[in-house]
Amino acid sequence: MISARSAEALTAQAGRLMAHVQANPGLDPIDVGCSLASRSVFEHRAVVVGASREQLIAGLAGLAAGEPGAGVAVGQPGSVGKTVVVFPGQGAQRIGMGRELYGELPVFAQAFDAVADELDRHLRLPLRDVIWGADADLLDSTEFAQPALFAVEVASFAVLRDWGVLPDFVMGHSVGELAAAHAAGVLTLADAAMLVVARGRLMQALPAGGAMVAVAASEDEVEPLLGEGVGIAAINAPESVVISGAQAAANAIADRFAAQGRRVHQLAVSHAFHSPLMEPMLEEFARVAARVQAREPQLGLVSNVTGELAGPDFGSAQYWVDHVRRPVRFADSARHLQTLGATHFIEAGPGSGLTGSIEQSLAPAEAMVVSMLGKDRPELASALGAAGQVFTTGVPVQWSAVFAGSGGRRVQLPTYAFQRRRFWETPGADGPADAAGLGLGATEHALLGAVVERPDSDEVVLTGRLSLADQPWLADHVVNGVVLFPGAGFVELVIRAGDEVGCALIEELVLAAPLVMHPGVGVQVQVVVGAADESGHRAVSVYSRGDQSQGWLLNAEGMLGVAAAETPMDLSVWPPEGAESVDISDGYAQLAERGYAYGPAFQGLVAIWRRGSELFAEVVAPGEAGVAVDRMGMHPAVLDAVLHALGLAVEKTQASTETRLPFCWRGVSLHAGGAGRVRARFASAGADAISVDVCDATGLPVLTVRSLVTRPITAEQLRAAVTAAGGASDQGPLEVVWSPISVVSGGANGSAPPAPVSWADFCAGSDGDASVVVWELESAGGQASSVVGSVYAATHTALEVLQSWLGADRAATLVVLTHGGVGLAGEDISDLAAAAVWGMARSAQAENPGRIVLIDTDAAVDASVLAGVGEPQLLVRGGTVHAPRLSPAPALLALPAAESAWRLAAGGGGTLEDLVIQPCPEVQAPLQAGQVRVAVAAVGVNFRDVVAALGMYPGQAPPLGAEGAGVVLETGPEVTDLAVGDAVMGFLGGAGPLAVVDQQLVTRVPQGWSFAQAAAVPVVFLTAWYGLADLAEIKAGESVLIHAGTGGVGMAAVQLARQWGVEVFVTASRGKWDTLRAMGFDDDHIGDSRTCEFEEKFLAVTEGRGVDVVLDSLAGEFVDASLRLLVRGGRFLEMGKTDIRDAQEIAANYPGVQYRAFDLSEAGPARMQEMLAEVRELFDTRELHRLPVTTWDVRCAPAAFRFMSQARHIGKVVLTMPSALADRLADGTVVITGATGAVGGVLARHLVGAYGVRHLVLASRRGDRAEGAAELAADLTEAGAKVQVVACDVADRAAVAGLFAQLSREYPPVRGVIHAAGVLDDAVITSLTPDRIDTVLRAKVDAAWNLHQATSDLDLSMFALCSSIAATVGSPGQGNYSAANAFLDGLAAHRQAAGLAGISLAWGLWEQPGGMTAHLSSRDLARMSRSGLAPMSPAEAVELFDAALAIDHPLAVATLLDRAALDARAQAGALPALFSGLARRPRRRQIDDTGDATSSKSALAQRLHGLAADEQLELLVGLVCLQAAAVLGRPSAEDVDPDTEFGDLGFDSLTAVELRNRLKTATGLTLPPTVIFDHPTPTAVAEYVAQQMSGSRPTESGDPTSQVVEPAAAEVSVHA
């Protein structure tokens, strides 16, 4: 096997190899082939097959001369599609078939023996004697011909699989379909053998007679001529039909075609197969077939009966009967496979009788058809030739497997024949072209490009750039699924740095952090060598960073010394005397099982020997894999391969499963450079350390390592270390963000656009020349009984509308108008049928760009104006128009790897993004008297936490997260009321996984509560209790005004006040009044927290009296209005921290009113303990009820704090620890549908391995009969889980209800559900039918809704729906699939809006074949890649899954992006609007929020200098909009309208303060707190900043030091 990058290089390579073989007559051809099999594969390929050295040389000679002869396959992969293995039927048999392969290939022999033994159980004679005997007539008898073909075909298929030729589809011809069914996994070997023998025996027992005639005619021509007793047996090609039946009738038809000059051929058969003459055997055969149990195909399987992919009835008894009687639709099968993307057909059987039929059947397109065992050619040469033919045109072949067991060994062969061309420009006088031209020193090193000497010190810095493009060999160093720069590479970098300063010894080098390599991403490296000390030693460090905007990461550090180590021992005697060879024939396979997935460049280890405690190894640099050892001291791939011997030696002696990496190198000296073939000796160097001596091929010294220490690392630790080091890629989940856009009414000339017409008018033909037609979907409502039915009805209607529209070919726009089908963040999706219609319409948009616009609105809109905006999808809420953009989901805070002593803290920058994780060692200190240590599961977030994070808390801010819940880990002295294992809630004093707390401040969690529910109680209920009961001493019959009544403290205070007989008045924003009404308030007792109208309203309701108590958390004029509402003797309780008044001034201005600003901490531990007990008792007696809770993973704290700061929550916001979800799932049961599919199986294994789930229920229609179910269950059981595989059609409501009823009786509580089932039936919109929609909807919509209803009353922690990105972006040809998945997306939002667990994972493309991706060809994958979507591995998919669960937004788009492809589409103007926020734009200055303000001002002033006034303003407007977008959580500055008022954009007092903080840092100006309200739009603020920057200071509208008096987070109480 030879390959090259060009045709010229291929012939040159053949010439070099031919000359080498001729010059070395001792070379064994097997060794040559084995060595070539390990090389990299390029585009231009050739395979030479020969039985002798002479034949191989002749083949190489013809190839080198450009005239390839017999036994030589030459080709170049084009658009490689799917591969099909075809099994021939009766007539292909011949005496001796398979005998040569049986003797040459053990895999063929093993498979043949297994099949023959099974067949012999049913045959009257041993099959081997028949096939390899001398009686051809016996073999030709149907009784033996059919089993014989089955045996040879199954064994041939085993060879193909062993060689790595893995087909996408299989099909057979007549009895050959039984071999195909077995190959696809439908039939077990025992069942298939029984069936094939019975088939042949029963046919043989029929009376002889009848005729079969092949005629050159079409099926349509033959069909009218058929009469009684004769039929069509096979349609082998469009113009090749076999007639079968009574001899006279068959011959009569044949004679008619012969008379027309058509080719007619009488087949030599004993019976007329596939004809009416077969009917006497059918009944008995049906009884045999009924004993066979069919399974779901593991490969695509095409049916002879239908000519299409096997359907649900494939393999039934009736099917096999029909298969005997009905025609073989072989031509239809071949054509259907071509429509599925098949380009390569391999006939696996004796002869090549089907190749012609396939070629005739296929459309005139590129397709290769080869036969594996051609007649009149040695069988092994024929099989190898077939493999070579498909390989040269793109089908993967594992040539190393071909040579396995041959005894071949790797030998030195000529390296690649480079076709050298010069692409470098000749340096001119205009600029430097190398390091010297830039004033830098050149290194002449392959990894380091330049050296810089510090002029003011003795320090030296060496720089370089690494990438998988420039150093492709690095891509072969894969550890636990991650491409790592090898530890040996750091040694090479430091050795070169030592050479620069005259230090020949690495005294020590410790690896601090991995250097991860990502495709398409370059990495800068710097080796920093410090100044020499008195003894000449120098510190050395290696740093890396991904791009200019990232910080440097320390990867390694150590010390250099001057003197080299002593010369190592002599290894000239080789192999060493007395050393025993160690078998490493499967060495790299063993290493792969332990996480070392080394590619060819790192597979240089060729031999190992052992002598006592010593170990010896030989390594050869794989030059053909791009490992060039020149310009290196010791190539990292060579040194790394040396160390592989250690891994294999451990494997051989200890059966270790650890993955270990180099950690600390000591005493390293390089004695010679450029070695490509080395010998190595290993010896013990103390505890856990080894020494290494490396010599060249003559035994002379190359490298010495006095001591090397390795350390184990798991895949999880590696991922955590990569993340903590900032080395993770930016490929996290995406979310759909609806951003406000500006809409200008009127056309270009200011005139209004023509009015739109309705769909009814369009259908009636009365639409005239309207440019916009509107089809409005009537809302289906939300009745549970009608939801599924409404989805079917709506999608059917939508299909009819879309098909009519697209068929009309009108130059107009169709507007699909819905209400509640999509929504803003946090909104309920009230019309799930509309959600499904959006999915279908998105697919129609993708197929027909520019013809359809989707609009979802809450009020009447002008569709003509919106249709002209240029956005394909729009959402209108409250008069504001929004457009969707994909945006990276919020980044997770990085947690310390393997560290539990940490705490969430404010970062000090005045913004919520500054939240950080800080070490907290005090929680691990020894316990004092009365203390307990708690493993925290959940922490409540309060308003004061948000205030503290923004730097607004007066005085010393407390730790974030005052309250929480968890489990007691340890008790200190004098603790009597609590024990280890108790679940407790209370005041834990910080947001982290561990807390130490006084026992007085916690109490036990009530039975049946979750930790999140418990964490929501202490602060809010005790704050309300302390304020109302202790401070206000409120009494029955009095009245209280509670501001922010839907917040945590507000809802708690409402419950307590009512419990005590108090009349309650409450405020909230109007959007939350329905919540208040649901709490039992009438409108007379509800006020608006965004205006002061509540004062007048409540005075009127109370007939001018007012209220007795105010519980306040507002600021500014809201405080004054509330004070005016108090009666004489009234009590004003201030919980807020932003507007605290002077009590004496209040008393003077409001006679008789008592003003008290308070904090719960004033109560003291003893009183807090009493209140905790009292509250707990009221919960136990059900006089108090738990609050609504919104949970966030603590790693999403910035998003949670922002959610709370914007007053979007109802009840409490709670942060859960990363382990909380795993703990909940591990304690309960998780139900997975579709678990045997590609996605479901990966997630099932991940839940067990990563989350510790111990009870799994895998539901599918076929239960344990589903393909792969038994294997999956066994794997999960071995991993420690209890697994139940159940047969349940989840689309059947009664079946689902029954399943969950059973689970409630027999299993731990269900805590999680994953719905991963689904089916495909792809077609473009114009080809879809209602039936095809229903097929796809049933598996997704019915099933998901049934699961939703069955679990709505359960306390789930996870309800995950496996959706598809097709629903989000609109996938051409998948309108039904997009509709079904859009329903899932809407259902997840619907559940979250109802307070239930719910997330929809819109999966992108999985790299793993099978399941939903089985139908995709390489052409499909390439198209998807060009679109900007990259395939993800299972490891990458579960990382996205974990991140999505942590972020917990209703919709997570789980896909990897190809940024280069996105950029290319953007530059070509072909990037959909939805993706526009993901393409990298021209580089702009980014504001450094943590930078020095003075430097920011200076930099900004420099940018403004020299610009015209309008240009300055434009720049500043962009700056303000950028910071505003960051505060509002929008993707970019373009998502903020510069002329919209901040209040309308969504700003309130808190967010206004944050924006002011950001602008202060970005501009360097001292900005007043009221700047956002004094200048109400981004443009106005930019104008103000421009004046300040120019030195002009306008008159302020008020005192710049005054308090902000705008509405202050009206619904957020101080502790809620």
Swiss-Prot record:
- Entry's InterPro entries? Ac_transferase_dom_sf, ACP-like_sf, Acyl_transferase_dom, Acyl_Trfase/lysoPLipase, ADH-like_N, GroES-like_sf, Malonyl_transacylase_ACP-bd, NAD(P)-bd_dom_sf
For molecular function, the Gene Ontology terms on record are: fatty acid synthase activity; oxidoreductase activity; phosphopantetheine binding
Which residue intervals are annotated with compositional bias (Polar residues) in the record?
1588-1604
Query: Could you tell me which residue ranges the Carrier domain spans?
Result: 1514-1589
Q: Does the keyword Phosphoprotein apply?
A: yes
Q: Where is the signal peptide?
A: none
Checking PROSITE patterns in the record gives: CARRIER (PS50075), PHOSPHOPANTETHEINE (PS00012), PKS_MFAS_DH (PS52019)
Fetch the Gene3D superfamilies from UniProt.
3.30.70.3290, 3.40.50.11460, ACP-like, Malonyl-Coenzyme A Acyl Carrier Protein, domain 2, Medium-chain alcohol dehydrogenases, catalytic domain, NAD(P)-binding Rossmann-like Domain, Polyketide synthase dehydratase
Residues given in the record as NADP(+) binding sites: 1040-1057, 1229-1244
Cellular component GO terms, alphabetically?
A: plasma membrane
Q: How is the cofactor bound?
A: Binds 1 phosphopantetheine covalently.
The protein's matches in Pfam families, at most eight in alphabetical order, are given as: Acyl_transf_1, ADH_N, ADH_zinc_N_2, CurL-like_PKS_C, KR, PKS_DH_N, PP-binding, PS-DH
Instruction: Outline the extent of the PKS/mFAS DH domain.
Output: 445-719
The GO annotation for biological process reads: Actinobacterium-type cell wall biogenesis; DIM/DIP cell wall layer assembly; fatty acid biosynthetic process; lipid biosynthetic process
Q: Where is this region: N-terminal hotdog fold?
A: 445-567
UniProt cross-references to SMART domains, sorted A to Z: PKS_AT (SM00827), PKS_DH (SM00826), PKS_ER (SM00829), PKS_KR (SM00822), PKS_PP (SM00823), PKS_PP_betabranch (SM01294)
Q: Where is this region: Dehydratase?
A: 445-605
Identify the stretch(es) annotated as Enoylreductase: 910-1215
Outline the segment boundaries, as ranges, of region: Beta-ketoacyl reductase: 1228-1409
Kindly give the CDD domains that the UniProt entry links to this protein: enoyl_red, KR_3_FAS_SDR_x
Task: Please name the PANTHER family in this protein's record.
Answer: FATTY ACID SYNTHASE, INACTIVE PHENOLPHTHIOCEROL SYNTHESIS POLYKETIDE SYNTHASE TYPE I PKS1-RELATED
What the protein does comes down to:
May play a role in phthiocerol biosynthesis.
Q: What is the protein's name according to its record? A: Putative inactive phenolphthiocerol synthesis polyketide synthase type I Pks1
Q: Which gene encodes it?
A: pks1
